[in-house]
Amino acid sequence: MIKLIVGLGNPGAEYAATRHNAGFWLVDQLARMGHVTLRNETRFHGYAARATLWSHEVWLLQPQTFMNRSGLATVALARFYKILPDEILVVHDELDLLPGAVKLKLGGGSGGHNGLKDIAAHLTTQQFWRLRVGIGHPRNLLPPGTAPSGQHDVANFVLKAPRREEQELIDRAIDRSLDALPDLVAGNAERAMMRLHTTG
């Protein structure tokens, strides 16, 4: 059963449309579905709201600490409400999946994602759920015949907005995720993964 859904991203209007904020996009959708407003909660270092989703109470959180300090916000809320690591779902952008792909898993490494790394360090465990929203890697998304250059490095790539066709694929992946989340929130992870990984 999931009691806390954390969307990863960077605060501020200048980052709102960037690939690194894919986690924020999904949590924004959940807030709309739950008819709640994410409010600045200084004790949790982020925007948070408690929503009733699919007949379950779930906390929604968007850390406002910048990506590399996401663990600070996640642990503050989880400890306050006595939420266990395996009751937490972290939604994040994933370079190793193409736009349109999305994967759900429990545990595993951080894959070089600094937000995940910081959350694992603060929770002192890797055993939390991750929803990996594919954004692609600059080496896979270059036009044919284009050689990678400095401007295509990963740090620059994740802080840019996706191209229109990529954004459409990411939006579709988020919609598919929302279809699978009721099962995960209710504690049926196997069915959620089957639904997510065998569609689209």
Curated annotation (Swiss-Prot):
EC number: 3.1.1.29
One Pfam family linked to the record: Pept_tRNA_hydro
Enzyme kind, highest EC tier: hydrolase
Cell compartments where the protein resides: Cytoplasm
Active-site positions on this chain: H20 (proton acceptor)
Molecular-function GO terms, alphabetical: peptidyl-tRNA hydrolase activity; tRNA binding
Catalytic reaction list: an N-acyl-L-alpha-aminoacyl-tRNA + H2O = an N-acyl-L-amino acid + a tRNA + H(+)
Any one biological process term the GO annotation gives: protein quality control for misfolded or incompletely synthesized proteins
Swiss-Prot/TrEMBL site (Stabilizes the basic form of H active site to accept a proton) positions: D93
Family matches, as Gene3D superfamilies: Peptidyl-tRNA hydrolase (3.40.50.1470)
Site (Discriminates between blocked and unblocked aminoacyl-tRNA): N10
Keywords, comma-separated and alphabetical: Cytoplasm, Hydrolase, RNA-binding, tRNA-binding
A single GO cellular-component term on record: cytoplasm
Residues the entry annotates as binding tRNA: Y15, F66, N68, N114
HAMAP family on file: Pept_tRNA_hydro_bact
Function: Hydrolyzes ribosome-free peptidyl-tRNAs (with 1 or more amino acids incorporated), which drop off the ribosome during protein synthesis, or as a result of ribosome stalling.
Oligomeric and partner information: Monomer.
Similarity field: Belongs to the PTH family.
Name of the protein this chain belongs to: Peptidyl-tRNA hydrolase
Species of the source: Ralstonia nicotianae (strain ATCC BAA-1114 / GMI1000)
Native organism taxonomy: Bacteria, Pseudomonadati, Pseudomonadota, Betaproteobacteria, Burkholderiales
